[in-house]
Amino acid sequence: MPVVYVNIFLAFIVSLVGLLIYRSHLMSSLLCLEGMMLSLFVMLTVTVLNNHFTLANMAPIILLVFAACEAALGLSLLVMVSNTYGTDYVQNLNLLQC
């Protein structure tokens, strides 16, 4: 396995461990999720370019669109929680029963 793939996989694992450790604040969780999506995007792009998959050229762009939608929804939820309760604790999400 080339060094590039190992480094990208390690970036994904570090983001996953960060998500598991720093799950009390919503902002930390969102940053870790964004790191995971970025490492998946880079891994998918490198794989498509190295293996010359012509049919999968749009897959990294589609993943990036889903990551942008996830980030927008996460930030809107963060704004709603912080305006309502004044903090960004994940435990406050259980109280948002609309």
UniProtKB/Swiss-Prot annotation:
It comes from the Eukaryota. Pfam families: Oxidored_q2. One of its GO terms (biological process) is ATP synthesis coupled electron transport. The keyword Acyltransferase does not apply. It is an enzyme of class 7 (translocase). Keywords: Electron transport, Membrane, Mitochondrion, Mitochondrion inner membrane, NAD, Respiratory chain, Translocase, Transmembrane, Transmembrane helix, Transport, Ubiquinone. InterPro entries: NADH_UbQ_OxRdtase_chain4L/K (IPR001133), NUOK/Mnh_C1-like (IPR039428). GO terms for molecular function: NADH dehydrogenase (ubiquinone) activity. It catalyses: a ubiquinone + NADH + 5 H(+)(in) = a ubiquinol + NAD(+) + 4 H(+)(out). GO terms for cellular component: mitochondrial inner membrane; respiratory chain complex I. It is found in: Mitochondrion inner membrane. The chain crosses the membrane at residues 1-21, 29-49, 61-81. It is a multi-pass membrane protein. Its EC number is 7.1.1.2. Core subunit of the mitochondrial membrane respiratory chain NADH dehydrogenase (Complex I) which catalyzes electron transfer from NADH through the respiratory chain, using ubiquinone as an electron acceptor. Part of the enzyme membrane arm which is embedded in the lipid bilayer and involved in proton translocation. PANTHER family: NADH-UBIQUINONE OXIDOREDUCTASE CHAIN 4L (PTHR11434:SF0), NADH-UBIQUINONE OXIDOREDUCTASE SUBUNIT ND4L (PTHR11434). Core subunit of respiratory chain NADH dehydrogenase (Complex I) which is composed of 45 different subunits. Belongs to the complex I subunit 4L family. This is NADH-ubiquinone oxidoreductase chain 4L. It comes from Ursus maritimus.
